[in-house]
């Protein structure tokens, strides 16, 4: 399945942009392959990273729906998933576990509400479950633990700059 996104987003990341998933690789050699249907995720962590990137880049609602297990997928439209109400700042993989056709990924995603740029950076800490059927990994569901909380202004910034949050993204 070919997934298209806003061409300006793609153009900005295609050649030299670092992938938002935190792998350190260039987007075209990382999650873009999955987003455009050139490859499929081979493990739960790879799928988790590609889904995070889809949320961060926006315009990839179809990809998010296609990688969500049909039995747990809510009645959302691709357009609803394309709404960018958060600025995604970073992804931290806490733990992964894969056994046969099941897997879990515990992660922390750092974000700030777009409508309130002065808001504190928030952390979404989730344990996501994945299932592989027919060689295709899909997101099942996730448990948020604990509920999203603000990041201290004195903590290292989630963007990875090495600066304190108050001197970087929370400035």
Residue positions per predicted region:
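Short, flexible, mixed-charge glycine/proline-rich loop motifs
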Residues: 2-14, 145-152
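Glycine/tyrosine- and acidic-biased, solvent-exposed loop/turn segments at the edges of beta-strands
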Residues: 13-17, 35-41, 149
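Short Cys/His-rich zinc-binding micro-motifs
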Residues: 14-25, 153-163
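Short, surface-exposed charged micro-motifs
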Residues: 18, 95, 127-129, 156
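Cysteine-centered loop/knuckle micro-motif
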Residues: 29-31, 166-169
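Core segments of small alpha/beta cavity-forming domains
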Residues: 33-76, 81
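Surface-exposed, charged secondary-structure patches
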Residues: 84-123
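Short beta-strand edge/turn micro-motifs at domain boundaries
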Residues: 123-150
